[in-house]
Amino acid sequence: MKLANGVIRHTFGAPEKFSCLRTLSFTPRRKELASLSDPKPPFSREEIGFSSSSKGTVFTLPLTPGERLYGFGLQLKSFEQTGKKRIVRNNADPQADSGDSHAPAPFYLSTKGYAVLVDTARYAKFYTGCAKRLDGIRGADKQLGLNVQELYAATGGGNQVYVEIPFAQGADIYLFTGEDMRDALARYILYCGGGVLPPLWGLGIHYRTKTDFTAEEISSVVRELRDLDMPCDMIGVEPGWHTHAYSCTYQWDKF
């Protein structure tokens, strides 16, 4: 279903009541979206694979050779997300490049100028070109390798994005198509109500201090950064200064 220029929603199965967009109260910026071009989507609904079972829902979305993907919200361990397994799951202290983060999102951008939002609030898994269907691994000839080189020859990355949503029996997939990545992202923002420009320092460089730093140690770090002319717009204070942290014991009457 076309929702606006460059914005399409495909509904598969029975979407859950609670999801990223279904639980939000927002008004799309339709006037601004109407002023934009209406580019052709990179792929059709028929090219999206969908299946569901007692375990949940699986989607497959096209991915062309050379296409690079970015996104999935805050990712502390990597920038480009092509050829990876991403678990969209909240985690305050991710230790590996698995997709866990403080603010993950079931959303990715492509260098082909489109973005995809899989509207789910569950811990979904995305395989971004790192998996292949068994019937496509060997290619057209499907010949069994006869030596070490043939058996372990690189067959290239997968040609699809696989999405697994546990327990769900369906979901909405939003496709935002633009002239380039920036334009696709703009359509996503406008459709979700538009963004607010934060103060410029909020877009600056953030330095977070060690958990057990005291006020004196934090002040010392700030002075050293300034003395060395190192740019820093924000200092993050970890909750070690609380009486107890996680969950914290912040008490207003002490300040």
Predicted regions located by residue number:
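Catalytic and substrate-binding clefts that recognize carbohydrates or anionic sugar/phosphate headgroups
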Residues: 1-199, 209-211, 215-216, 222-227
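Aromatic-lined carbohydrate-binding/catalytic grooves of carbohydrate-active enzymes
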Residues: 193-255
